[in-house]
A protein has these predicted regions:
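Carboxylate-rich helix-loop segments that flank metal/cofactor sites and access channels
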Residues: 57-107
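Alpha-helical bundle segments that constitute or directly flank the non-heme di-iron/ferroxidase center
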Residues: 2-32, 94-117
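A structural signal for well-ordered alpha-helices, especially hydrophobic packing surfaces
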Residues: 19, 26, 52, 59, ...
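Preference for long, well-ordered alpha-helical segments
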Residues: 95, 99-148
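N-terminal/domain-start segments enriched in small and hydrophobic, helix-friendly residues
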Residues: 4, 10, 77-78, 148
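Surface-exposed helix-capping loop/turn segments at secondary-structure junctions
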Residues: 31, 61-62, 119-120
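Conserved alpha-helical segments that form or flank metal/cofactor-binding pockets of metalloenzymes
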Residues: 36-73, 140-147
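Alpha-helical scaffold segments that form or flank carboxylate-/histidine-based iron centers
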Residues: 3-14, 34-53, 92-96, 121-135
Length: 148
């Protein structure tokens, strides 16, 4: 597997995890009565879906096939969110705590992707997406502080 294909596949899985995780977090925030946080989580879910589609299309242009099913780590993270909800309820603060962890993980994976020997075209996309993921991570941290 080429480095571009491997990196692209890893990022697509991470982004699919984010899409699903933020959709679930949006549901939990809505149930907890916080439409602002819920709306932002739904926005991030849509953003991650768009990022994944961009990478899938880029890979297809190069003749690579990719999977869009999410990773085992992401499934575990979403499972952890479900367990945490069962134990600690579905408070916005609890959901934000999990979202902060998820965003830190996403930033780390994007940074690791940039450490790889990837093509200039893929690097440009990853740099741009990482900047937006970092911005989202900062906003999630700010929301966490406001809802503590």
């Amino acid at each position: 597997m080429s480095t571009d294909k491997s990196v692209t596949q890893d990022l697509i899985l991470t982004l699919e995890d984010g899409k699903a995780g933020f959709a679930k977090a949006g549901e939990k925030a809505a149930e907890a009565g916080n439409p602002e946080v819920a709306g932002y989580f739904y926005e991030l879910s849509s953003q991650r879906e768009g990022f994944a589609k961009e990478l899938v299309e880029m890979a297809a242009d190069y003749g690579d096939e990719t999977e869009e099913h999410g990773s085992l780590g992401g499934a575990i993270h979403r499972g952890w969110m479900t367990i945490k909800d069962a134990i600690g309820g579905s408070s916005v603060a609890a959901v934000l705590d999990v979202a902060v962890q998820g965003e830190a993980h996403a930033v780390k994976l994007f940074e690791e992707a940039l450490a790889e020997d990837i093509s200039p075209d893929l690097r440009r996309v990853v740099v741009r997406q990482l900047a937006e993921v970092r911005t989202a991570a900062q906003r999630v941290l700010a929301l966490q502080s406001m809802n503590a």
